[in-house]
Structures are given as structure tokens and as C-alpha cells.
Amino acid sequence: MARLTLDDVTKVYTDEGGGDIVAVEEISLDIDDGEFLVLVGPSGCGKSTTLRMMAGLETVTEGELRLEDRVLNGVSAQDRDIAMVFQSYALYPHKSVRGNMSFGLEESTGLPDDEIRQRVEETTDMLGISDLLDRKPGQLSGGQQQRVALGRAIVRDPEVFLMDEPLSNLDAKLRAEMRTELQRLQGELGVTTVYVTHDQTEAMTMGDRVAVLDDGELQQVGTPLDCYHRPNNLFVAGFIGEPSMNLFDGSLSGDTFRGDGFDYPLSGATRDQLGGASGLTLGIRPEDVTVGERRSGQRTFDAEVVVVEPQGNENAVHLRFVDGDEGTQFTATTTGQSRVEAGDRTTVSFPEDAIHLFDGETGDALKNRELPSNRAIDAFVSN
């Protein structure tokens, strides 16, 4: 069993003038045994610092870090039974694949040579690199080197894997292959895993749950679909998803949201969810924007196509409201067969069941999009 718990964990550094720099502030997380949790956020948000505190490479300023019932504060990195995989493969260039994978076991355990050899060979079989055992790192591709780095962690048979952007040095094709490989390995091994990334695709496709950080604070923890469809606040709404959610600042006048270039009438049911908020931000995902059709019951507006980005299977269409400021643009995704071009006049519709509304002052979500009343979806996004 390996349940990892962060209880109000804080990390504070001291600058040259003696002032405090709060890198991580009161983060609380319960990571279940065997769970794959992804820590995601922009550069400098505190995700790698959080991972390094878990590993024992950074001290915890305040709060408590536990592995099951064992408090890890003050426990050295080598005594935590936690293995870490870095962005840099950090392989010994003069050692073979076998030597790189066995070195840690030879130096820090009392395991007999036969058992070390067996562990290395079983792990290389699992990773599909058994034919590379006698090669040096300089003779390996980037993907092969990453597999060796993973294998070095796996042979330790740790309670927890920590991975700090391990795929960022690979090209796009290899990253896609390794995402699948990592998910397969983690499922087979059943080891609790915490994975740090800034990559949207990795966050959405790899984790059982996603923890979104910004400016050292935890913004939301949930399944990938939960964070995508039901963001807690403006930051999560704007950060999760590519292209990102369209966000329009405005105000409430009676039952109408008034934005730059468009007025959006709200139903009574939506209005009732807003409390006393008057300053609002309206959000809608690009895939929920309908282009070129006037649909009854949906709010439809005149727009002009600014730029079209063909992506093969779909297009990212950047538009602006005809009656709005030229600087206020938004995005719709359409099929790859869509025939719109820059300069075209068209219409866009924002279905009310697809919009999000956020408090203009706090950024907190007041209304998230409606989802189908499907038992499987509801169960998935509410865990």
C-alpha cells in the first residue's frame, strides 16, 4: 500500500534581502494507492517544487507529508522508498544499459547479484529494450534513453514513482508513443505515480486525476473531464483545454449578459445560479460554438472570420463580433471540410446549455456547462 498525503504543505524560500518567497502555499492532496495523479500548471506555478518535496530533495517549510502513516518530513530522500524520473535522463555515459539500471541497486541495497540481474532483465523485457543491455547511452535514441531512465526507477520496486516532465525532450511522435507506454506500465505495476507536466495533452490523457496549480496554490483536483467541463474558476477554465475556453467579460443587466459586441439573454434557471453577482465573465469552449447556422432556441450573433487555421481533421476558426471591438476575438473549432475563409461574414451560436459563467470579481464558477444525464458520465466527472 502506498497512499501519499500532503497536508497543508508549504514551501518558503528566502531572497537575498531576507524576504520570504512563497513557492507553494498550503497544498493538501490525498493520492490513493496505485493512482496516477498529474500535477499541471504553467511554468513557475510550484509543481516541480511540490514534487521535489515529495522526493525529499526540498524541505517542507510547513505542513506534513505522509506515506501511509509514516511522516516523511525530515526523512532523507534515499530512505523514502520513492523513485524519481527527471526531464534529463541523467544516464552514466560510460556505463552500459545494464550498468545504468543496476548501479543504484548495487550501491544502496544488499541484494545479491543474481537478484539484481534478474530484476534488470525482467524490467528490460517489460520495456522492450532487452536487446540494448550492452549498449552505451550514446548509442541509443532519445526514446530508448527515456526507457532506460524509467527502467532504472522500476528496478528499485519503489512505493511511489515521481516523474518530472520526463517526455519533454522527445519529439511529438515519440511523446505520443511514450504516453501510451507509461500508462501501460503504470497499470501493470500498480505503483502510485505523481507526474508533473505543463502539457495539456499529457494532463488530459494520462492521469486518473489532475491537480491544477497556479502561483503556488492548488486550484482544482478532479478527473480530467471534471476539470475540463466543470472548472472551479477562471484560471482552470482558461488553462485546461486547447484551444482554450473563450472568455468574455461583461455585466448583468436584468436577465441579460452584456458583453463587448453582443447581448446574451439568460433563462430564469441560469439567472438563479448567479446569486448577487453583477460583474460576470461568460465562457464557452470552441467546440461548442456553432458557425454558420441559425438555430432556434440558441443565441445567434453576426461575426467575421479573422483567421482560419487548418489542422486536417478540424479547423480552428478565429472570429470577432461584427458589432464588437476588433481586439475582442474568439475561437470556434469546425470540421476539416468546413468552407470558411478569412474575411467571411457568418453567424455564430452559443447554446445556453454549453456556457459557463464566472464571478467577475473572484473568478469563481457560478455556472458550468450542462452535461448529458448519462449515469456513466455523471459518475466519471463527480469522482
From Swiss-Prot:
Topology relative to the membrane: Peripheral membrane protein
Enzyme class (EC, first level): translocase
Keywords: ATP-binding, Cell membrane, Membrane, Nucleotide-binding, Plasmid, Sugar transport, Translocase, Transport
KW 4Fe-4S (keyword) present: no
Database matches in NCBIfam families: PRK11650.1
Protein's name according to its UniProt entry: Xylose/arabinose import ATP-binding protein XacK
InterPro entries for the chain: AAA+_ATPase, ABC_transporter-like_ATP-bd, ABC_transporter-like_CS, ABC_transpr_MalK-like, ABC_transpr_MalK/UgpC-like, Mo/tungstate-bd_C_term_dom, NA-bd_OB-fold, P-loop_NTPase
Reaction equations catalysed: D-xylose(out) + ATP + H2O = D-xylose(in) + ADP + phosphate + H(+); L-arabinose(out) + ATP + H2O = L-arabinose(in) + ADP + phosphate + H(+)
Cited PANTHER family: MALTODEXTRIN IMPORT ATP-BINDING PROTEIN MSMX (PTHR43875), TREHALOSE IMPORT ATP-BINDING PROTEIN SUGC (PTHR43875:SF15)
CDD domains recorded: ABC_MalK_N
SUPFAM superfamilies: MOP-like (SSF50331), P-loop containing nucleoside triphosphate hydrolases (SSF52540)
Gene Ontology cellular component list: ATP-binding cassette (ABC) transporter complex, substrate-binding subunit-containing
